[in-house]
Each structure stands twice: as structure tokens, then as C-alpha cells.
Regions:
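Positively charged n-region of N-terminal signal peptides that target proteins for export
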Residues: 1-4
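Bacterial N-terminal signal peptides
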Residues: 7-15
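Short boundary/loop segments of OB/S1/cold-shock single-stranded nucleic-acid-binding domains
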Residues: 20-36
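Conserved hydrophobic positions within beta-strands
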Residues: 40-42
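Short aromatic-glycine-enriched beta-strand elements
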Residues: 48-59
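Short, structured beta-strand/loop micro-motifs enriched in basic residues and often containing a Trp
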Residues: 72-80
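Short nucleic-acid-contacting surface segments enriched for D/E, G, S/T with interspersed K/R
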Residues: 80-96
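OB-fold/S1-family single-stranded nucleic acid-binding modules
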Residues: 101-128
Length: 132
């Protein structure tokens, strides 16, 4: 009986670990070896766990306006870096660089840097990174 209990616990732990790994596999959603830059006006800021999102209206080269979803860190992680739910406001004009989504039609980006030109606020995902 103990043997079955141990086998069951090991199997459950393996499944939970696999699920956590899959959840944090950004490579499944984003092209991490590529970088794009988007510029637009903030229409929504979801400051939450496990991931925050910034939504922007971006004017494409052909003049159409497209809404982009930009994935950011979780609220707890961002607070430790000085970001709060008050950091960004609807209407803020921002420039974001990051990894593009695998499906271009999804208009997704995983944020690396953010710059708000009106006051020079900047955020870099990598330690010590400053946005020009």
C-alpha cells in the first residue's frame, strides 16, 4: 500500500511540475530571439498576477490602428521594481520593445523595455537596463 502511495505522490509531483514549466514557457508564445518596437497610446493597464498586461493602440505603417497586448511581469515582481498600478495611465504615449508573438495576427509582445517620452519614465526588464 505504501508503495502505491509513493508512486502516486511522485506522479502527481511530476504532473504539477510539468504544468508549471509549460505555464512559464514564454518560448511557446513569443519569438525570444527577435525584438520589435511598438509605439502607441495606452488603452488598458492590467496590473495583476501572475502576469500584468499593457494594451496599446498602435498605428501601423498602412495607417490602420491595431490594439496590441503587451505581457509584463506579475504585480508582485513589478512592485519590487518600483512599478505600481498608478505608474501608467490611460492615454499615456509609450514606446515598447520586446519579443514578438509567434502569430503576428495576435498582436502580442513580451515586454523588455518601456519608455514614456513625456516625462522620461523608463523600465528595463534586465537588471541595470536603461532605456534611451
Amino acid at each position: 500500500m505504501k508503495r502505491f502511495l509513493v508512486i502516486g505522490l511522485v506522479a502527481a509531483a511530476a504532473l504539477v511540475g510539468a504544468r508549471a514549466y509549460a505555464h512559464h514557457s514564454f518560448a511557446a508564445t513569443y519569438l525570444e530571439d527577435q525584438t520589435v518596437q511598438i509605439e502607441g497610446d495606452l488603452v488598458q493597464f492590467l496590473f495583476r498576477n501572475p502576469h500584468s498586461f499593457v494594451h496599446l493602440n498602435v498605428k501601423e505603417k498602412d495607417g490602420t490602428v491595431v490594439r496590441y497586448a503587451v505581457e509584463w511581469g506579475g504585480a508582485g515582481q513589478l512592485q519590487g521594481l518600483g512599478v505600481t498600478r498608478e505608474t501608467l495611465k490611460i492615454g499615456d504615449h509609450v514606446i515598447i520593445t520586446g519579443s514578438p508573438g509567434r502569430n503576428p495576427k495576435d498582436h502580442r509582445v513580451r515586454m523588455v523595455t518601456l519608455l514614456r517620452p513625456k516625462d522620461g519614465y523608463n523600465f528595463g526588464r534586465r537588471p541595470g537596463e536603461v532605456v534611451d
